[in-house]
């Protein structure tokens, strides 16, 4: 089947036309100018009232259609940025190059990069609803927030007092969600000393790739491998059998992504007295790890190869300190939800490892659907204090607690029988809306961006059509709400 690079002939046509258009505009998180200017121009071209605030949020207002003037307004919300990750060896500049999207069968995906379905499909849905002349709906307060994937600067600085709605529909989730995790992002900074590579020792490069990666909240229950933790295990196995110097190490932050993504790649350069002996130990360790993850990570690749190095190694003490941190920092699923089955309770993700000239950074994302994340963060701080390294709090984001009236929930259950309500494992901006707009009824109704935050990300055309049509039906039913 030939690839459809322009997404033509897909339904709903307006959705895929919009999705293709925004995929041509670089919109990496932290680079909001282009996409927000495009949204403003789009609104102007269609006679829609819209403005952009200082945080680069775009707020658009669509009047109620005839007969819906007395219905409560509805907030529709998506975010305009995307996580930008590319495969090893792919030539792509996210600051200027369009995403090379294509459709094949029931799938829309991208060549060699993240697709941006998270949350481009939500943006495309909203653009289509705003311009549908046949639709029937209450007044729509449409919010496109900026920088959701990193700082959530848009959600933090949005003026919530401007909204009149009693109902809110988020289009940045997976299925029918009624709650989500809160989040704490932290950075661990360790000073790094220098020591010359010992005379006669040879350098080896360790490289881990081929992992799924993905979203550290929504994919936590899958218990995928974290490349940073695998690298730690390789080095620990080597240390038990021999000695080595650690020259540099890095992991995660593929394409600029932060610790919210599970690290899909990691690498290190080490110096050893006997390369053959070290390669033997590392090969055995690699086979052990591949066997452990043979089902969850069938494409895992662990390569060890000779290399040249012209820089100093870490001191032996700093090497041990870093190994202690990589080993002891909590990573992976911590607990499951006490009410909803197969739902995240709490998780911690060591998502970034970066050895720089004078320091080493480890970035950690901690999530929970209750208050357990605060205790997990206390654990991290006390561990780092014991080891004598610095911790920095990057941000703290609220959870989204269940807030749906019985009447609306009954309507939604009947409309979405294939999608039972559940809690999102990820952290979104919904908690800002529900905590700052008293009495707001909030749900998330969105097709799945499968494998988001990875280069395997894709959308199902069938599922997108289902959710788009159901949302149009829902808005029409809200005449008397």
For the regions a language model picked out, list residue spans one by one.
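Acidic/His- and Gly-rich active-site-bordering loop/insert found
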Residues: 2-106
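Zn-dependent metallopeptidase/amidohydrolase metal-coordination segment
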Residues: 7-15, 338-341, 345-361, 365, ...
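A short beta-alpha structural unit
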Residues: 20-24, 255, 268-269, 301-313, ...
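Active-site metal-coordination/substrate-binding segment of hydrolases
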Residues: 68-166, 203, 316-319, 331-337, ...
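Fold-level recognition of mixed alpha/beta catalytic cores in primary-metabolism enzymes, strongest
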Residues: 137-227, 235, 239
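Active-site-adjacent substrate-binding region
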Residues: 219, 228-248, 394-440
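A conserved active-site cap/scaffold subdomain adjacent to cofactor or substrate pockets
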Residues: 221, 227, 259-332, 336
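His/Asp/Glu-rich mid-to-C-terminal helical/loop segments that flank catalytic regions of hydrolases
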Residues: 224-241, 274-278, 320-327, 334-338, ...
